[in-house]
């Protein structure tokens, strides 16, 4: 198993799909990395040489991925909450942030129904 950005990349998958195992790299970015490095998209990770894996490591290293990206997202949400802006308040209350209706839906964000106590 190749190890890129602290993640074990699955050997039995094609390069494009295997790179998506890294948090912060989707299919589009994965295809761009393969095009930039000159590695074919349909080659399996197990068939790559050690030099090609090193080239992939360098290409992935240019992006903010994994722990750094998670930390960046958490800090930006925390910043919104500290500012006290509308989006921050919605995050703090655990409600939808992007203008969705909450009268009937939003069960995922609000959690299970709480019965009214009499």
Swiss-Prot record:
<protein>
    <recommendedName>
        <fullName>Small ribosomal subunit protein uS13</fullName>
    </recommendedName>
</protein>
<keyword id="KW-0687">Ribonucleoprotein</keyword>
<dbReference type="InterPro" id="IPR027437">
    <property type="entry name" value="Rbsml_uS13_C"/>
</dbReference>
<comment type="similarity">
    <text>Belongs to the universal ribosomal protein uS13 family.</text>
</comment>
<dbReference type="InterPro" id="IPR001892">
    <property type="entry name" value="Ribosomal_uS13"/>
</dbReference>
<dbReference type="InterPro" id="IPR018269">
    <property type="entry name" value="Ribosomal_uS13_CS"/>
</dbReference>
<dbReference type="GO" id="GO:0005829">
    <property type="term" value="C:cytosol"/>
</dbReference>
<comment type="function">
    <text>Located at the top of the head of the 30S subunit, it contacts several helices of the 16S rRNA. In the 70S ribosome it contacts the 23S rRNA (bridge B1a) and protein L5 of the 50S subunit (bridge B1b), connecting the 2 subunits; these bridges are implicated in subunit movement. Contacts the tRNAs in the A and P-sites.</text>
</comment>
<dbReference type="Pfam" id="PF00416">
    <property type="entry name" value="Ribosomal_S13"/>
</dbReference>
<dbReference type="GO" id="GO:0003735">
    <property type="term" value="F:structural constituent of ribosome"/>
</dbReference>
<keyword id="KW-0820">tRNA-binding</keyword>
<keyword id="KW-0699">rRNA-binding</keyword>
<keyword id="KW-0694">RNA-binding</keyword>
<feature type="region of interest" description="Disordered">
    <location>
        <begin position="94"/>
        <end position="118"/>
    </location>
</feature>
<keyword id="KW-0689">Ribosomal protein</keyword>
<dbReference type="InterPro" id="IPR019980">
    <property type="entry name" value="Ribosomal_uS13_bac-type"/>
</dbReference>
<dbReference type="GO" id="GO:0006412">
    <property type="term" value="P:translation"/>
</dbReference>
<dbReference type="GO" id="GO:0015935">
    <property type="term" value="C:small ribosomal subunit"/>
</dbReference>
<comment type="subunit">
    <text>Part of the 30S ribosomal subunit. Forms a loose heterodimer with protein S19. Forms two bridges to the 50S subunit in the 70S ribosome.</text>
</comment>
<dbReference type="GO" id="GO:0000049">
    <property type="term" value="F:tRNA binding"/>
</dbReference>
<dbReference type="InterPro" id="IPR010979">
    <property type="entry name" value="Ribosomal_uS13-like_H2TH"/>
</dbReference>
<dbReference type="GO" id="GO:0019843">
    <property type="term" value="F:rRNA binding"/>
</dbReference>
């Amino acid at each position: 198993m190749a190890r890129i950005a602290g993640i074990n990349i699955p050997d039995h998958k094609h390069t494009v799909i295997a790179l998506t195992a890294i948090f912060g790299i989707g299919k589009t970015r994965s295809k761009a990395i393969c095009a930039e490095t000159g590695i074919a998209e349909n080659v399996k990770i197990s068939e790559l040489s050690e030099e090609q894996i090193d080239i992939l490591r360098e290409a992935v290293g240019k992006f903010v991925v994994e722990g750094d990206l998670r930390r960046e997202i958490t800090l930006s949400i925390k910043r919104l909450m500290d500012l006290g802006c509308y989006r921050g308040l919605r995050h703090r209350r655990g409600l939808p942030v992007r203008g969705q209706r909450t009268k009937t839906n939003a069960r995922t964000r609000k959690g299970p129904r709480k019965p009214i106590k009499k």
